[in-house]
């Protein structure tokens, strides 16, 4: 039904949005997820499907692909409506308090509350635009769907953040050789990841930047790197190049929706309330003092946002859902 009104609409179908949808089901809320991408999963699905995620309690290690699959299966427990390939561009509060959400394609959605779980917004990788990179469309990579294609190959990773280091470590056991190129010296990554990197077989080239791509017939065979301290150059043989130079994020029109924002997201209180009554935020969308930006923390914030939405609709409702082991939905 086009004018159907939902109790809560979750904008963003990444890990936090998916778990929030599961929890809203525990609270018997009619739920919709709207995601801008063709499928749910967020950045984890698109950029880290084969990376190992280790920052969720009780799960020592899981690939991004499997994490998303598990969260999607869990979210579907209570049959939320999931809408993909729609980017919400406008939110208006109607006279009766209902929110009208308008998508980029003109679709209209109605909801009594909204939970924003869009992460840092829509995203686009920073691509290597210079050095005739377009000549090597099959050798330059920004994400990976099948890591096995790099088995026994010489691979170069460029970047100095968590993503670059994670890829270097993920590729190291299967590639013939892995080089890591970083223009700086102090890696912008978790301390333990850096320690493991330095103890691995990955050959690290700090203070170096890629200055030339060499190959024929769309096949990359070598790269030249230049030391930004001495201006000396060296050539590295390679068959594949990973570029991890960050992403461009876009909050779109959210700045116009009326809530307070800061440098790192939408300002919320300890109940995940934004400055607009009825709109809540969680995960990387939200910011507050001493916030921890890991998936596990977002999985905690999602239920808080849902509980606040429930109380907004029903002030006398319980503060939180019955735990799943005692919830009526799971008792025979």
Swiss-Prot record:
Origin: domain of life: Bacteria
**One MF term in GO for this entry?**
NADP binding
Q: Which residues bind FAD?
A: 35, 43, 48, 88, 123, 284, 325
Reaction(s) the record says it catalyses: 2 reduced [2Fe-2S]-[ferredoxin] + NADP(+) + H(+) = 2 oxidized [2Fe-2S]-[ferredoxin] + NADPH
Keyword NADP in annotation: yes
Query: What is one GO biological process annotated to this record?
Result: cell redox homeostasis
Q: What does the UniProt cofactor note say?
A: Binds 1 FAD per subunit.
Q: Which HAMAP family match?
A: FENR2 (MF_01685)
UniProt name for this protein: Ferredoxin--NADP reductase 1
Which species is the source of this protein?
Listeria monocytogenes serovar 1/2a (strain ATCC BAA-679 / EGD-e)
């Amino acid at each position: 039904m086009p004018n159907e009104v939902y109790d809560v609409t979750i904008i963003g179908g990444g890990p936090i949005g998916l778990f929030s949808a599961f929890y809203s089901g525990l609270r018997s809320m009619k739920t919709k997820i709207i995601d801008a991408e063709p499928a749910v999963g967020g950045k984890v699905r698109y950029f880290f499907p084969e990376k190992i995620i280790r920052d969720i309690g009780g799960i020592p290690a899981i690939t991004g692909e499997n994490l998303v699959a598990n969260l999607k299966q869990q979210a579907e427990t209570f049959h939320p409506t999931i809408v993909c390939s729609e980017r919400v561009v406008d939110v208006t509060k109607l006279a009766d308090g209902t929110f009208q959400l308008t998508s980029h394609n003109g679709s209209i959605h109605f909801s009594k509350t909204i939970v924003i779980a869009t992460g840092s917004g829509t995203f686009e990788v920073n691509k290597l635009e210079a050095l005739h990179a377009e000549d090597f469309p099959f050798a330059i990579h920004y994400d990976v769907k099948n890591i096995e294609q790099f088995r026994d190959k010489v691979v170069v990773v460029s970047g100095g953040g968590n993503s670059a280091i994670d890829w270097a470590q993920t590729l190291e056991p299967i590639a013939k050789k892995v080089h890591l190129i970083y223009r700086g010296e102090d890696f912008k990554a978790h301390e333990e990841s850096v320690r493991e990197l330095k103890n691995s077989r990955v050959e690290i080239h700090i203070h170096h930047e890629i200055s030339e791509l060499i190959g024929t017939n769309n096949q990359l065979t070598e790269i030249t790197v230049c030391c930004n301290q001495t201006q000396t150059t060296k050539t590295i043989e390679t068959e594949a190049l990973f570029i991890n130079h960050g992403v461009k994020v876009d909050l779109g029109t959210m700045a116009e929706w009326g809530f307070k924002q800061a440098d790192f997201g939408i300002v919320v209180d300890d109940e995940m309330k934004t400055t607009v009554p009825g709109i809540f935020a969680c995960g990387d969308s939200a910011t507050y003092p001493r916030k921890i930006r890991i998936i596990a923390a977002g999985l905690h914030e999602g239920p808080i946002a849902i509980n606040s939405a429930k109380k907004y609709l029903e002030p006398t409702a319980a503060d939180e859902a019955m735990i799943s082991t005692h919830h009526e939905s799971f008792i025979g």
